[in-house]
Amino acid sequence: MKTLSAKPAEVTHDWYVVDADGKTLGRLATQIATRLRGKHKPSFTPHVDTGDFIVVINADKITVTGKKAQDKKYYRHSGYPGGIKETNFSKLLAHKPEDVLHKAVKGMLPKGPLGYAMIKKLKLYAGTEHPHEAQQPKALDI
């Protein structure tokens, strides 16, 4: 018996919706990264994008434990000398709530063309509304 190797044309991508209300950042991000990569499927193949589409609602209500709301730092650079900017979790959550979960999940995915294709299947929304009702996403309890 041979090992199954998934072909890109044969892979089906399902749609799931996840409610992030009250969920812990890291625990939710690991589950989402696993689903985006496709490691939960028996037909997982490392060099093929076998993952599903994930729609996350209520991204503005995600939590962290301890004092990480003030202590967790996020950095970005403008490209100019001395252009490094720093913000903490609570400020980033107030300003751009989708970026918190996006950065956490992106760091858990492989780097390169396949990883970039996987992160595009993650759809993040701060509120309860999302424009993906036509895809009939299934509720995923994490």
From Swiss-Prot:
- InterPro entries in the cross-refs: Ribosomal_uL13 (IPR005822), Ribosomal_uL13_bac-type (IPR005823), Ribosomal_uL13_sf (IPR036899)
At the top level of its lineage, which domain of life is listed? Bacteria
- Family annotation (Pfam families): Ribosomal_L13 (PF00572)
Q: Which UniProt keywords apply?
A: Ribonucleoprotein, Ribosomal protein
Query: Does this UniProt record's set of keywords contain Ribonucleoprotein?
Result: yes
Q: Does the keyword Ribonucleoprotein apply?
A: yes
Gene Ontology terms, MF aspect: mRNA binding; structural constituent of ribosome
Q: Which NCBIfam families match?
A: rplM_bact (TIGR01066)
Its biological function? This protein is one of the early assembly proteins of the 50S ribosomal subunit, although it is not seen to bind rRNA by itself. It is important during the early stages of 50S assembly.
User: Record's family?
Assistant: Belongs to the universal ribosomal protein uL13 family.
Task: Provide the assembly information.
Answer: Part of the 50S ribosomal subunit.
Name of this protein: Large ribosomal subunit protein uL13
Q: Which organism is it from?
A: Psychrobacter cryohalolentis (strain ATCC BAA-1226 / DSM 17306 / VKM B-2378 / K5)
